[in-house]
A protein has these predicted regions:
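Bacterial N-terminal signal peptides
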Residues: 6-14
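Positively charged n-region of N-terminal signal peptides that target proteins for export
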Residues: 1-5
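N-terminal organellar transit peptides
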Residues: 18-148, 152, 162-172, 177-294
């Protein structure tokens, strides 16, 4: 039998599992293990009447699912929204976490949590990760601007029952890469056949997963067209058409932009017709003096 002649160790890489294959910038600024913690912000920090949320961030490592499940089972309030900021990682772990989020009927959003108690300029050094790992709530700030959930994180995100991608955050996808180690000297055709079977299996697993999550098969078709080395940022019409975020008027919260001249900002996207296009709207408020704004 084939299995007696050859010994293959195969690893299906979905975005981010193999560090040797990543561009260095892809995971810059992210912890090497998926981190989860309770965060508490200012009143209405995560929406009207919401000041507490669950932060999940960093690379999706191969032990992430058990860790995330254990943490969430201990959270007394199942209605707390989950904010994701991750460059991806292990796809099997993403599937497992997604299925647990679905069973929990979770609300997931793409957002970046910042802990002021951490050293300025970093959120992933050992001291900061220790703060986040401590029991209880962590005082934090929340932002959707430039937050990202890409690669395998997108699968994790799809598990939530309620999914919200703010107009200034990113959900992105790309195809898988198959890597395997060959022991011995098998015929090239045997290697090619093995590769083909594994990729077919990966596509099938993805299709089954997306169908279970209620997502259009069009997303899987799109993923197959995007090379592993690239990322496709899902557009608002795609988010709507694929059934990922079907809100007719997605928007951001009002946020203070700490520029040379600070201002508060809000962005919204309004669905046109059947959702094939969205109208972008942005508001900016500046203070001209202590008594007047514009």
């Amino acid at each position: 039998m084939f299995s007696r002649l050859l010994f293959f160790v195969a690893l299906l890489l979905i975005p981010g599992v193999s560090r040797a294959e990543e561009a260095p910038v892809e995971k810059a600024g992210f912890a090497k293990k998926l981190t989860i913690y309770l965060a508490k912000g200012a009143p209405n920090a995560c929406g009207a009447g919401c000041d507490r949320w669950i932060a999940i961030e960093g690379e999706i490592d191969r032990d992430a699912a058990a860790r995330i499940r254990s943490f969430l089972l201990a959270v007394k309030d199942p209605q707390l929204p989950i904010y994701l900021h991750s460059p991806g990682g292990n796809v099997e772990q993403s599937y497992a976490i997604a299925r647990f989020l679905r069973a929990r009927k979770a609300t997931a959003r793409v957002g970046r949590t910042n802990v002021p108690a951490c050293s300025a300029g970093t959120q992933i050094d050992a001291a900061c990760l220790k703060i986040k790992a401590a029991k209880g709530e962590v005082e934090a700030e929340l932002s959707t601007r430039n937050a990202m959930c890409v690669s395998a994180c997108a699968y994790l995100f799809l598990g939530a029952t309620v999914r919200e991608v703010a107009p200034d955050s990113v959900l992105a996808v790309h195809n898988s890469r198959l890597m395997f180690v060959v022991h011995g000297h098998p015929p090239p055709q045997a290697v090619a056949d093995f590769r083909r079977r594994e990729m077919v299996s990966a596509d099938r697993d993805r299709n089954v997963f997306l169908a279970a999550m209620g997502i259009s098969h069009e997303l899987s078709d799109l993923i197959r067209t995007v090379k592993f080395e690239n990322l496709h940022v899902l557009t608002r019409p795609e988010l709507y058409r694929f059934g990922i975020d079907t809100r007719p008027l997605p928007d951001t919260l009002w946020a203070v932009e700490k520029e040379t001249r600070p201002y508060v900002r809000k962005i919204a996207q309004q669905k046109n017709g059947n959702g094939s296009s969205f109208r972008m709207m942005e508001w900016r408020l500046f203070c001209e003096n202590k008594d007047r704004g514009r």
